[in-house]
């Protein structure tokens, strides 16, 4: 197995553990407080590594309006995803999150004028049907978390589409640094009305979430440098396995057979979509891409 694929598995496992910790923290702290601390802590691993760019160049932008808009959509997406993790089943969050490629494709056609082959549209539609099997609207009462997560998927698609447009022209330090700065300021303000001083144990969990997210991002970057993206991208679907496992072990969540079939449909269509895509160089963030804009 290529080293990059192993690193990708470790990266997505780190993300999944961090997501499980978010779910445990949610009932006690607001999503904005969780986002503030975890995003702040997530930059620690990056600060300990060698940087190729200077932080003082962070504000030198070629597309300032788009970069700032991306920061706002990423922050909004973060709040949606964290809310969903604390209100609906673990695996359902990931299943809905995997609809993001569908929205990215739609936006790429509408805004970036990209051509999308017919077979990719078919696979994306099949993937969406898989999500319908998971959440089954009309057959059961959907919770607010389902709608919020769908909004998060749309916001994630907007964030990713903007990133695909500006990434070749902007500094990485600008894209990452401004995202962290925006997140710190906006979440610091929004968390004030419901702010709760974290206990030492909660602070330790928040630190763990941030470090795991930051380390996962670095592992994914290293994986992309060593192995082609078309081999790394399918690994993201391992998160559904972690979600089912963690949901059963720690949250007493057991998807029924229809939901499991839906997840298999999502994974199968997603893998075929990735494997039939023409290789190209681009930023490929994780499924939880929009939380800290990695």
Predicted regions and their residues:
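Hydrophobic transmembrane alpha-helices of multi-pass small-molecule transport proteins
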Residues: 119-135, 156, 258-277
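Helix-helix packing/entry segments at the starts of transmembrane helices
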Residues: 94-99, 166, 170-181, 217-248
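C-terminal transmembrane-helix exit sites in multi-pass transporters
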Residues: 81-83, 100-122, 194, 241-260
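Juxtamembrane helix-entry segments on the extracytoplasmic side of multipass membrane proteins
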Residues: 1-4, 36, 59-63, 136-155, ...
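Hydrophobic alpha-helical transmembrane segments of multi-pass membrane transport proteins
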Residues: 10-17, 21, 68-83, 151-162, ...
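Transmembrane alpha-helical segments that form core, pore/gating elements
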Residues: 16, 20-23, 27, 31-32, ...
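Membrane-interface interhelical linkers
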Residues: 1-10, 43-69, 170, 181, ...
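C-terminal-most transmembrane helix of multi-pass membrane proteins
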Residues: 241-294
């Amino acid at each position: 197995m290529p080293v990059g694929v192993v690193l990708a598995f470790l990266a997505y496992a780190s993300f999944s553990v961090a997501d499980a910790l978010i779910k445990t923290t949610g009932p006690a702290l607001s999503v904005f407080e969780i986002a503030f601390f975890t995003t702040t802590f997530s930059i620690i691993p990056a600060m300990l590594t060698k940087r190729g760019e200077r932080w003082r160049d962070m504000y030198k932008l070629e597309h300032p309006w788009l970069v700032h808009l991306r920061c706002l959509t990423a922050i909004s997406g973060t709040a949606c995803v964290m809310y969903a993790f604390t209100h609906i089943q673990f695996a359902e969050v990931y299943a809905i999150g995997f609809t993001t490629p569908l929205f990215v494709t739609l936006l790429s056609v509408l805004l970036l004028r990209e051509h999308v082959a017919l077979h990719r549209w078919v696979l994306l539609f099949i993937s969406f049907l898989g999500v319908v099997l998971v959440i089954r609207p009309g057959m059961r009462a959907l919770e607010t978390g389902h709608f919020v997560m769908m909004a998060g998927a749309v916001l994630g698609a907007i964030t990713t589409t903007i990133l695909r447009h500006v990434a070749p022209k902007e500094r990485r330090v600008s894209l990452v640094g401004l995202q962290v700065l925006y997140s710190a300021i906006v979440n610091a303000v929004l968390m004030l009305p419901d702010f709760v001083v974290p206990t030492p144990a909660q602070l330790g969990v928040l630190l763990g979430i941030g470090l795991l997210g930051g380390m996962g991002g670095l592992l994914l970057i290293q994986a992309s440098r060593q192995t082609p993206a078309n081999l790394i991208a399918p690994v993201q679907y391992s998160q559904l396995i972690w979600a089912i496992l963690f949901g059963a072990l720690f949250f007493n969540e057991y998807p029924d057979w229809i939901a499991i079939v839906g997840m298999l449909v999502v994974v199968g269509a997603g893998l075929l979509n990735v494997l039939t895509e023409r290789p190209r160089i681009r930023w490929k963030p994780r499924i939880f891409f929009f939380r800290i804009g990695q």
